Amino acid sequence: KSVAVVAASIKLLSAEFFSAVGVDINHRVTVAGLDSSASFNSMCMGGKAVSYETDDLRDDVVASILAAQKDDPKIGAVLLECTTLPPFAKDITDQTGLPVFDFIACIEWMHRAIHPKRY
């Protein structure tokens, strides 16, 4: 299985970037960007948002992952690189059937390790 890494801009996650952090982008990594999302660019990338239409942003985020899934049917998980995207994790899972990892999930996982729940 491969991992779909979703970023604000696909240009920011180049092969050189991945190589610098020890990841071979040609081995089980698919990069999806929100470069063409008008709602994302307006709200998050310095555009002049008139309103914050989170439904539009959610739809664009899910669409980018569905497109990546179509291009690479071996995707088995999604990693949200952008800190704006975790609110859409459930929508992504509901639409794709894939588990979603993001910085909030990482914090919760580490918190559970430090403060385990008694069962």
Task: Give the location of each predicted region.
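Short, flexible loop segments at boundaries between secondary-structure elements
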Residues: 100-119
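Short, surface-exposed amphipathic charged segments that create phosphate/polyanion-binding patches used
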Residues: 1-4, 19-21, 45-48, 114-119
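Periplasmic-binding protein-like
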Residues: 4, 75-83
